């Protein structure tokens, strides 16, 4: 993978987080559970996040251990393979608590990569 390819994957993750945040803005756990279309859109973007994570080189993942790379991949596996049993509280916690801090962390990786070129 060329150096720019993994940066594109980080950008894909950021775009998917942004979409999830847009889709769920103003929502609650209860309203999310009642809105299957939004759940499907969120699950699709969590899948993209997990898949994109697989394409970030191990060296980059090792350099940034505070980012939950394994959890991002694992969530993809859950929503793809256990899609009928996705836990709404876990999905909601991911949306509300886990994704927001990733935005600045991932932007920091892109800034570091730009600086190191």
PLM feature spans:
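Solvent-exposed interaction patches of small proteins and small membrane subunits
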Residues: 1-117
């Amino acid at each position: 993978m060329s150096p720019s390819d993994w940066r594109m994957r980080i950008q894909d993750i950021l775009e998917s987080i942004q979409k999830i945040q847009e889709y769920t803005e103003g929502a609650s756990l209860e309203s999310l559970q009642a809105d299957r279309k939004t759940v499907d859109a969120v699950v699709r973007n969590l899948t993209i996040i997990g898949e994109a994570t697989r394409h970030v080189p191990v060296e980059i993942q090792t350099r940034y251990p505070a980012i939950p790379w394994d959890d991002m991949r694992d969530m993809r596996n859950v929503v793809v393979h256990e899609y009928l049993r996705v836990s709404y509280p876990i999905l909601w916690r991911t949306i509300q608590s886990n994704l927001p801090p990733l935005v600045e962390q991932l932007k920091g990786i892109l800034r570091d990569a730009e600086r190191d070129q």
